[in-house]
């Protein structure tokens, strides 16, 4: 499962998840992608389950890009512990996902295969998501400053 090799601090505060993703919201590597539509803390187990579902479906064709990484430790106290006596030990790792964030990308397969692989992956995730295709729009010609 995914987790950082080392971190500067063992524990983090929870923080908030307001607003849409302002980075990581465009397709960069592949042709097809799965985009989150809701905010969530996505665990490393969920990311791994989705990756396995996609890999199993597309077999040896194509390439999968995982665009999220769980870098936030979540702590838990032991059950039936009295209040106080500090924060619990880190139990698992999560990735803070905001709406609009690209989760996975696929390249090198047909659209039907990519769509089905993403559907299987989305079933493993706790949020609504959508399948998107990279738009092949050519950049507009820039106006020249030459006098006419």
From Swiss-Prot:
CDD domains: Ribosomal_L16_L10e (cd01433). It comes from the Bacteria. Gene3D superfamilies: Ribosomal protein L10e/L16. GO terms for molecular function: rRNA binding; structural constituent of ribosome; tRNA binding. InterPro entries: Ribosomal_uL16, Ribosomal_uL16_bact-type, Ribosomal_uL16_CS, Ribosomal_uL16_dom, Ribosomal_uL16_sf. One of its GO terms (biological process) is translation. GO terms for cellular component: cytosolic large ribosomal subunit. Keywords: Ribonucleoprotein, Ribosomal protein, RNA-binding, rRNA-binding, tRNA-binding. The keyword Transferase does not apply. NCBIfam families: rplP_bact. Binds 23S rRNA and is also seen to make contacts with the A and possibly P site tRNAs. Part of the 50S ribosomal subunit. HAMAP family: Ribosomal_uL16. PANTHER family: 50S/60S RIBOSOMAL PROTEIN L16, LARGE RIBOSOMAL SUBUNIT PROTEIN UL16M. Belongs to the universal ribosomal protein uL16 family. This is Large ribosomal subunit protein uL16. It comes from Gloeobacter violaceus (strain ATCC 29082 / PCC 7421). The gene is rplP.
């Amino acid at each position: 499962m995914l987790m950082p090799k080392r971190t500067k601090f063992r524990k983090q505060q929870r923080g908030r998840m307001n607003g849409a993703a302002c980075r990581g919201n465009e397709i960069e590597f592949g042709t097809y992608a799965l985009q989150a539509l809701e905010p969530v803390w996505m665990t490393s187990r969920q990311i791994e389950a989705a990756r396995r579902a996609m890999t199993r479906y597309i077999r040896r064709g194509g390439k999968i890009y995982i665009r999220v990484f769980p870098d936030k430790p979540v702590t838990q106290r032991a059950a039936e512990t009295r209040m106080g006596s500090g924060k619990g030990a880190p139990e698992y790792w999560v990735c803070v996902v905001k709406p609009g964030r690209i989760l996975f990308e696929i390249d090198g397969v047909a659209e039907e295969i990519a769509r089905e692989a993403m559907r299987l992956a989305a079933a493993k995730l706790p949020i609504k998501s959508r399948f998107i295709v990279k738009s092949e729009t050519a950049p507009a010609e820039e106006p020249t400053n030459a006098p006419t």
